[in-house]
Amino acid sequence: MELKVLFSEDPAFVLSRAGHFLSSQPVHHNLILSTLHARVAHAEQGRYWMAIQRADIVGVVLQSPLTFPATLTPMEPTVATAMADAIAEAGIALPGVNGEAAAAARFAGQWSERTKSAAIPFEGNRLYELLQTAEVPAVEGKLRQALPKERSLMILWSRAFQQEIGESADGTELRVDRGMAAGQLWVWEQSAEVVSMAISREPVQGVVRLSGVYTPREKRKHGYAAACVHALSKKLREGGYRCILYTDLGNPTSNSIYRRVGYGAVSEALRYRFK
């Protein structure tokens, strides 16, 4: 059966063509769905590929911003191979790939063979979904949205977070401004001091992804991040949303925190760097 790879730079077209496929698994496809919706709302350069078999979409890969690694949906090995081949044949130099473990591994392996570059796995992630809002030890303070006067602090913390997870901090100010305008930046306040932050991404198909959970080093080991995530997750769940987040498998502390809050593992993902 013939497998075609269709390229586009138009996120609206990709949503119109692949929307049904992506919405069929809103948790597994959330990262790509939310990125596409964001690019439609706020124009930013991007590259998008759709794998088509018998007129059906069977996989999607995107790269946006263009300095970022590619992100892919879960897909069959043959589809991941075809995607890597098509992108390599187009002469596009990807810095890396992120995605569901098996698909990312197959893509990275094929990319390495086709481009004669090294594919280095450097981080394992786990996708979690909130199954229940478990009770956690009480922590003094409260959850609230970040205030305009805290913009500089949110930018500082967001850059520090990106640095800690090994991602580019390009565009941080713009993302913070958009997040604050949309009411998506949240903080944990204790005794009139902001001690932790978290981001709730735009809801897509009833799913909200939490990200950017950060506490400065001098404020860690007090339970602030757990309290912030617990309160935010509970608030979103009570609003009828499903909550998800990704964690670094190299950080057992954060994984245990999220399990205590009520999150359960869904799947694993891998991040590769190409050199």
Question: Could you describe each region identified by the protein language model?
Answer:
Residues 3-9, 20-26, 33-92, 96, ...:
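Conserved donor-binding loop and adjoining core beta-sheet/short helix segment
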Residues 28-37, 98, 166-174:
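A short, aromatic/hydrophobic, helix- or strand-capping loop or linear motif
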Residues 53-57, 62-140, 272:
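Acyl-donor-binding surface of acyltransferase catalytic domains
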Residues 54-55, 62-67, 133, 156-211:
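Acetyl-CoA-dependent GNAT
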Residues 77-86, 211, 215-217, 221-237, ...:
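Conserved acetyl-CoA-binding loop-helix of GNAT-fold acetyltransferases
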Residues 98-104, 245-256, 271-275:
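Conserved beta-strand-loop-alpha-helix junction that forms the acyl-donor binding cleft
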